[in-house]
A protein has these predicted regions:
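Catalytic cores of RNA-modifying enzymes
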Residues: 1-218, 258, 274
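Peripheral terminal appendages
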Residues: 3, 38-44, 54-55, 235, ...
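Hydrophobic "lid"/C-terminal helical patch
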Residues: 33, 231, 269
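An accessory alpha-helical subdomain
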Residues: 194, 198-200, 205-244, 249-252, ...
Length: 274
């Protein structure tokens, strides 16, 4: 296949910087991402951000079927060339973030994995779309900005620990499985990236995840405020009653959200929701 840069130029493609378009061209890196995702010939894969189709092709070489979602229709002539000859790839020019679960399931089915080089500006929203909503993949492998990846896997009481860390932990286990230098992209972005894999499973069966997510967002609503004050501002429970609940769980009344574990937040959510 011709060089991606030449294909883009010959098709008159102009990068839309508002969409965070940075494409991977190194075949070894592309194959490594697919390997780390654990995709095999039995898997249906959803890719977000087809881009120039380089990762799409690498996934298609291993997967049973690839549904790749792209919002920039200007890439169609590029993809007609880069994905030619592949009969197990379907490019869908739609925004996954705006699609209802029913519409998505009708296209991709209910058993799938997500593999993507995600545009940085939608990273958190996209990951949570596949965790919080009713369509759950068995695994999510994404290339994200390094500092975002660090937040995904952070430990309690660290600078990077936050609502997204807890929210991901509610649905599965995240780990950084690779690092990618910014020079591996075209055009070259300003920051390095990390490859994160989230293995999704019913980690907290029986837990009301909607209520727990409310408590998580509340705990980190204003990081400089104490957990007690944040909870009091959101839940219809008197401050002294909330304080008693925290004390019953051996949580310091001056504690902030970033010092708590997910298990503690689940306990708080359960008691405040009664």
């Amino acid at each position: 296949m011709r060089k991606i840069k030449d294909i883009l130029i010959d098709n008159g493609f102009r990068f839309n910087h508002n969409l965070g378009q940075n494409f991977i061209t190194d075949k070894n890196l592309l194959d490594k991402i697919v390997e780390l995702s654990g995709v095999d010939e039995n898997d249906v894969v959803v890719e977000i951000g087809t881009g120039a189709g380089t990762l799409t092709r690498a996934i298609a070489e291993k997967a049973k079927k690839v549904y790749s979602f792209e919002v920039d229709r200007a890439l169609k002539p590029v993809l007609d060339e880069t994905l030619s000859g592949l009969d197990n790839v379907e490019v869908i020019f739609k925004d996954v973030l705006k699609m209802k679960d029913k519409e998505l399931i009708e296209i991709i089915g209910e058993k799938f994995k997500v593999v993507a080089n995600i545009p940085y500006y939608i990273t958190t929203a996209l990951v949570m779309r596949f965790l919080e909503e009713g369509v759950h993949p068995s695994a999510i492998t994404v290339m994200v900005q390094k500092e975002v990846a660090d937040r995904f896997v952070a430990k309690p009481a660290t600078e990077d620990y936050g609502a997204i860390t807890m929210a991901i932990s509610l649905y599965g286990d995240a780990k950084i499985v690779g690092q990618v230098d910014k020079s591996m992209f075209y055009p070259v972005p300003k920051v390095d990236s990390s490859i994160v894999r989230i293995d999704v499973y019913d980690k907290y069966a029986g837990v009301n995840k909607k209520k727990v997510n409310k408590a998580i967002k509340c705990a980190f609503m204003m990081r400089r405020k104490t957990l007690l004050n944040n909870l009091t501002a959101v839940y219809p429970v008197q401050k002294d009653e909330t304080a008693k609940i925290l004390e019953s769980l051996n949580i310091d009344l001056k504690a902030r959200g970033e010092t708590l574990t997910l298990d503690q937040i689940i306990e708080i959510s359960d008691l405040l929701s009664k």
